[in-house]
Every structure is written in structure tokens, then in C-alpha cells.
Regions:
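Bacterial Sec signal peptide processing site at the extreme N-terminus
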Residues: 6-11
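Exported/periplasmic ABC-transporter solute-binding proteins
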Residues: 15-301
């Protein structure tokens, strides 16, 4: 059965900055030995940093070698189609955000044998035009906006203009987090988004908010790492939620209320001496955590 494919994202569209670290990593794999990766768009820079640190290859070269099939498709392909002992087919290690519920159900029905662990923390963030005077919204105000109960910015301290609320498709990792962290913790009500307000990829959502004809009226969401370091756009800014502005510090201490972890995943039967298992285990070491932080993410213990 052929693999499913989503929007294939690559770092050519998502440049990542890396801060040099005083602790020089010790390579433990060759470039050819490094496991095949897949996962979420927002994890591309981390995958590149992992490959550079684990093999000693140049970071820019590592960036050009990473492509992903995006969150839902990565989980499906990995859990339903690929095998740990395949030498030339499918990913061997995922670096990925949480799977959508329907994918979790598919994996459970297939009795997929996967092993996963949290390696980092990110956050769901809300994006508005910098001309919008609203600086912070409560979680309940956000729920009411996306349920269609609040329809004007004047009801949350802004201008007397309609709120244009963008969403993502059901396959996206950010839509999964949006539902889990916000909508499902309320009454679960979510208005349907017309196609033009549900771009296929995160870059498209950011572009749409920036370019919308009445852009000061628009609101959308992403994960913090993507909007902060991979696809920042002039004229946009992040909202505080419950008065807390998202940032590495407020995500690390979880004072920002909409945080969630992301994962490394291997097949449960991956051999102890396999490259994917070596990298999976390495992510728990001090050097592995430094790699995560060097790439700009928040590592978890």
C-alpha cells in the first residue's frame, strides 16, 4: 500500500537559526547511518540540528536533507506502513507533535507497536495584526470567538469590526492542539471554517492573516516555535492569553496556559544497536538536551 502524503515541507521554505554552543557535540553516527526522519513542520530545525550534532555534518547541509510529510501523515505512515527493520523504506524515527484523534484511533485499531517520549515543549499561540489594539484574550474569550458567540472585536476591547477567525485543516498538528488545549476544555463548540479561512499549511495561515483585505480584523493560531523562528511575518504579533505572553521562559515554566509537549517516536521493536534507537536514547542525555535547546526549543526533563 502506498504511503499517504500531505504537504511536504522542507527547510528551504523554513530557515532555522542556530546558536553556537560552547559544548561541541561528539558525533556517534556517520551520515549514511543516521536514521530516516519524518514528523511535523515545526520540528524541521530540530531534526537538522540532531543530524548535524549526531554525525558532525554541516548544519546548513543537514537542513537541506530534511523533508517531512507533516504531523498526521507522519504518524500514519510510521504506525501503519513502515517497519523498523526496513533498510530503504519509510521513516525510522519521528520527531513530531501530537497525533490527531482520528489517527490515534487508526493506530489503536491496527495495534501499532510504537514507543514514544516527550522531548520538548511548545505552545499554541494566537496571531493578530499589529494594528489590532487588543493585547490579551482569555481562554474563554478565544473559545467564544471560535464558537461564533463573540463576533466583533469591540466585545473584547477592540474596534467595532467583525472578527475573521482562521483555522487549520483537521490533519494539522496545530489544529489538533487547538482542539485539545482550548476547545475541548470548554463546551467543545467550534464553528466550521470556510475553505478560504482554513489554509492547508502553517505558512499559508500566517500569510493569509498578513494579507487579508481587512487584516486588522483577522486572528489565527500556530505553534510558538514556527511563528517565532521559522516563519515570522512583518506586521503580525502574538496575543497574550490570560495576560501571559508566550515565550521560551513562559513555555518552560508553563505559566503560559496553552503548552503541550512534542515527541520522539520509534518502533517498539527497534534494536538496541540500531541507529534510530541510538538517536532516540541520545535525546535523553545532556548532549541531546543541549541539541534541543541549541535549535531554539524548550527541552523537557
Amino acid at each position: 500500500t502506498a504511503c499517504k502524503t500531505g504537504t511536504t515541507d522542507s527547510p528551504a521554505d523554513s530557515p532555522a537559526a542556530s546558536v553556537p554552543d560552547a559544548d561541541t557535540p561528539v558525533p556517534f553516527l556517520t551520515e549514511d547511518e543516521f536514521p530516516r526522519l519524518d514528523g511535523s513542520t515545526a520540528c524541521i530545525p530540530l531534526m537538522a540540528q540532531m543530524k548535524a550534532d549526531a554525525t558532525g555534518m554541516d548544519l546548513l547541509e543537514a537542513q537541506t536533507s530534511i523533508t517531512v510529510s507533516t504531523t498526521a501523515y507522519a504518524w500514519e505512515n510510521f504506525g501503519l506502513w513502515s517497519r523498523s527493520d526496513s533498510e530503504d523504506y519509510g521513516a525510522q524515527l519521528l520527531i513530531v507533535y501530537e497525533a490527531p484523534e482520528y489517527v490515534k484511533e487508526e493506530l489503536a485499531e491496527a495495534d501499532a507497536k510504537l514507543e514514544q517520549k516527550a522531548i520538548g515543549r511548545d505552545a499554541l499561540v494566537f496571531i493578530v495584526n499589529e494594528e489590532n489594539p487588543v493585547q490579551s484574550l482569555t481562554q474563554q474569550q478565544l473559545r467564544d470567538i471560535y464558537a461564533g458567540r463573540i463576533t466583533s472585536w469591540k466585545d473584547v476591547g477592540g474596534a467595532d469590526s467583525p472578527i475573521v477567525a482562521f483555522q487549520r485543516g483537521v490533519d494539522s498538528g496545530s489544529q489538533t492542539l487547538f482542539k485539545k488545549l482550548l476547545i475541548d476544555k470548554g463546551d467543545g463548540q467550534l464553528m466550521a471554517a470556510p475553505t478560504e479561512l482554513a489554509p492547508a499549511d502553517m505558512g499559508g495561515l500566517v500569510d493569509s492573516i498578513a494579507e487579508y483585505n481587512n487584516s486588522a480584523n483577522a486572528i489565527g493560531f500556530s505553534v510558538y516555535y514556527y511563528i517565532d523562528q521559522m516563519y515570522s511575518k512583518p506586521g503580525l504579533r502574538l496575543l497574550a492569553v490570560d495576560g501571559v505572553t508566550p515565550g521560551n521562559d513562559t513555555i518552560a515554566d508553563e505559566s503560559y496556559p496553552l503548552c503541550n509537549e512534542f515527541y520522539a517516536v520509534v518502533h517498539a521493536d527497534a534494536a538496541p544497536d540500531s541507529p534510530q534507537r541510538k538517536v532516540y536514547d541520545w535525546l535523553d542525555t545532556d548532549e541531546g538536551r543541549r541539541c534541543i535547546e541549541k535549535a531554539g526549543y524548550v527541552a523537557v526533563d
